[in-house]
Amino acid sequence: MAAPGGHYSHAVTANGFVFISGQLPITPDGSKLADAPFEQQAEQTLNNVAMALTAAGSSLDRLVQVRVYVTDIKSWPAFNAIYAKWVGSSRPARAVIPVPELHYGFKIEVEAVALAG
């Protein structure tokens, strides 16, 4: 995955949990998908969450909470379908929060908390 864009880590482990910083639709080579359709942005963002979890020694089935920020709440049905396929049978706590805008003009950002190990 691409290096963090600021003074932070993609993932931090503390007290048995892995905290995943807000992930954006940026490809591993650093390409920003701001002009891509929402669905493509969502898939890349969730892939970044999965990569950060793996790098921290955790996995999707250990997710506890997921926070999703979207710039258009009308994207909720599309996101929910992509998310359900991505997370599988796991059902962590989740919030989808509409926001007026995100960095670089992205349409989605996702942060998460998982159990370590």
What feature does the model see in each segment?
Residues 1-117:
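Short, polar/acidic, helix-capping and beta-turn segments at strand->helix junctions
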